[in-house]
Amino acid sequence: MLRNLFRRRLFSCPTKYYFMLLVLSLITFSVLRIHQKPEFFSVRHLELAGDDPYSNVNCTKILQGDPEEIQKVKLEILTVQFKKRPRRTPHDYINMTRDCASFIRTRKYIVEPLTKEEVGFPIAYSIVVHHKIEMLDRLLRAIYMPQNFYCIHVDRKAEESFLAAVQGIASCFDNVFVASQLESVVYASWSRVKADLNCMKDLYRMNANWKYLINLCGMDFPIKTNLEIVRKLKCSTGENNLETEKMPPNKEERWKKRYTVVDGKLTNTGIVKAPPPLKTPLFSGSAYFVVTREYVGYVLENENIQKLMEWAQDTYSPDEFLWATIQRIPEVPGSFPSSNKYDLSDMNAIARFVKWQYFEGHVSNGAPYPPCSGVHVRSVCVFGAGDLSWMLRQHHLFANKFDMDVDPFAIQCLDEHLRHKALENLEH
C-alpha cells in the first residue's frame, strides 16, 4: 500500500510535466547536434591571427599606421632569417590537395555561407595567373565563398608543376575550376584579353545565377569582405564599374599601328591600322572591370562587339581600351553615355586601387595617394605594410600589386583583418 502511494505521488501531474519537459529537451538537443555545422567551422578556428609561426609582427599596429611597427617590418624583410623562411612550393600543394578535407581545414577556407544576403548575391571571378602558387592560395582563400564561382586561367607557359598545383586546389571545390582553354599570355598583347574571355565563356555557360563578374590577376588582393563587396555591387543597381576616360593623345599610337608578337614580345610593325569599326570613340581604361552578367552575355554574343574585338587583336595593350570602350557603347547593358561628363577615373571606379609612381606624393599637396611603402615594378607600387592604413579607407574592392616575395606581412595583416571582420558578427 505504501509502495502504491509512493508511485502515485512520484507520477503526480507536476512530476509528469517535468519528466516530459526533460524528454523534449533531450530530443531537441539531439536534433541540433545532428544538424549543427562541422566542428572545424567554428569561428575561432577560422580566425587567421597568429597563423604564421615565423611572424612576430603586430598587425593591429600596422593597420593603424604605427611608424615603429612599419619600420620593424622593413628591417625584418632584410634579415637572413626572413630570406630563408620556409615556403610552400607547387609540389607541396600537389601533395596537400590529395586530401581535400585536410587541405580545406588546415588552410581555413570558409566552406559555408556566412549570411543569407551573400547567398542571394553570388559573384563570378576570372583569375589570370602564371606563377606564385602561395599567392594564389592566399588570394583564393580571401575571396572564396561556396555560393560564388571561380575560373582560374593558367598561362600555358607556366611550369607543369604550377598547373598541377592549381588543378589540385580547384579539385577540392565544386565551384572552382581551371579554364577550359588556356592561352600563352604575352605582356600587352591580345592574349591577355583572350585569357579573360575564355573564363567569361566558361562562367557564363556553367551557371545563370551569378550577378557580377570581377576579373583578377595573381597579384591582386581584396580590401573588402565578401559581404562588403556584395553591398557595393547592389548599390551599383545593374551598372558596370570600371575605369573609362577620354583617350589621351599619347596612347593613340597603341591602336593606330599594327603590333605583332616576335620572339615572345609585342613589336610595333609600323603598319597603319584601319580605324575602329564603331561610331563610339575609343576610351582609355585598365585591364580591370566589375561587370554584370548581362554585360558579359552582350560581349560574347553581339556581332558589333565581335567585330571590335577582331579589330583590336593586333593592337598594343587592348585590355586598356577595349573594356573601357565597350562600357561607353549605348546598347551595352549597364553602360555609361559616351559624353566626357561620364568619365570614370581609376580612383573613382571601385574595380582596383593601384598606385602609380609618377602620381605619388603628399595628399595634402594634391597628390591622389601617398608614396609607396614597398617597391616599384613598371612604375606600379608593390605594396608594403605601410600602405595598408591609407588603402583600407578607400572605396575600392581590390588592390594591386601584392607580392609574398616583397612584403608578406602586408598580405598577412590584410588577410587577418578581412577574415576577422567577416567573422566578428557571427558570435553575436
Swiss-Prot record:
Glycosyltransferase that catalyzes the transfer of an N-acetylglucosamine (GlcNAc) moiety in beta1-6 linkage from UDP-GlcNAc onto mucin-type core 1 O-glycan to form the branched mucin-type core 2 O-glycan. The catalysis is metal ion-independent and occurs with inversion of the anomeric configuration of sugar donor. Selectively involved in synthesis of mucin-type core 2 O-glycans that serve as scaffolds for the display of selectin ligand sialyl Lewis X epitope by myeloid cells, with an impact on homeostasis and recruitment to inflammatory sites. Can also act on glycolipid substrates. Signal peptide: none annotated. It catalyses: a 3-O-[beta-D-galactosyl-(1->3)-N-acetyl-alpha-D-galactosaminyl]-L-seryl-[protein] + UDP-N-acetyl-alpha-D-glucosamine = 3-O-{beta-D-galactosyl-(1->3)-[N-acetyl-beta-D-glucosaminyl-(1->6)]-N-acetyl-alpha-D-galactosaminyl}-L-seryl-[protein] + UDP + H(+); a 3-O-[beta-D-galactosyl-(1->3)-N-acetyl-alpha-D-galactosaminyl]-L-threonyl-[protein] + UDP-N-acetyl-alpha-D-glucosamine = a 3-O-{beta-D-galactosyl-(1->3)-[N-acetyl-beta-D-glucosaminyl-(1->6)]-N-acetyl-alpha-D-galactosaminyl}-L-threonyl-[protein] + UDP + H(+); a globoside GalGb4Cer + UDP-N-acetyl-alpha-D-glucosamine = a globoside GlcNAc-(beta1->6)-GalGb4Cer + UDP + H(+); a ganglioside GA1 + UDP-N-acetyl-alpha-D-glucosamine = a ganglioside beta-D-GlcNAc-(1->6)-GA1 + UDP + H(+). Residues 33-121 are annotated as: Stem region. UDP-N-acetyl-alpha-D-glucosamine binds at residues 128-130, 155-157, 187, 378, 401. The keyword Nucleotide-binding applies. Disulfide bonds join 59-413, 100-172, 151-199, 372-381. Coiled coil: none annotated. It is found in: Golgi apparatus membrane. GO terms for cellular component: extracellular space; Golgi cisterna; Golgi membrane; trans-Golgi network. Residues 1-9 are cytoplasmic. This is Beta-1,3-galactosyl-O-glycosyl-glycoprotein beta-1,6-N-acetylglucosaminyltransferase. GO terms for biological process: cell adhesion molecule production; core 2 O-glycan biosynthetic process; glycoprotein biosynthetic process; kidney morphogenesis; leukocyte tethering or rolling; positive regulation of leukocyte tethering or rolling; response to insulin; tissue morphogenesis. InterPro entries: Glyco_trans_14. Residues 122-428 are annotated as: Catalytic. A glycoprotein binds at residues 243, 250-251, 254, 320, 341, 358.
